[in-house]
Amino acid sequence: DELIRAGGTVDVAAGTAPDADDVAQGHLQAERALDFAACIGCGACVAACPNGAAALFAGAKLAHLSLMPQGRIERGRRARAMTRELDALFGPCSEYGECVPACPAGIPIEAIALLNREVLRAGLRGATRDD
């Protein structure tokens, strides 16, 4: 719940951002985003991890939202906020991959790589940018 409150949703008013239906979204990218959206937040990945990490869950949420036009608006803020909560509430990712076979939704380990990419991207862009 804390991770979702920290950034697991699209919270900003889009303002002048184009409507999602107006933005051409490639079929493969949309399918990829929907694959990550399959995460049900059950916690099986956390239970399977020897460190109690929630990196697969957080990665699935960040990947899903950053791949869709609606979620790109606040992707930097979301990555920073979610990783702050992730670090405070869960153990570090062991990178052993025990979480993947435990996931009933079939979220791939690529979600953890995408989590790391979003965090790095947000850090390189600085605390003042959200894109």
Regions found by a protein language model. Give the residues of each.
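Ferredoxin-type iron-sulfur electron-transfer modules in oxidoreductases and energy-metabolism complexes
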Residues: 2-38, 42-131
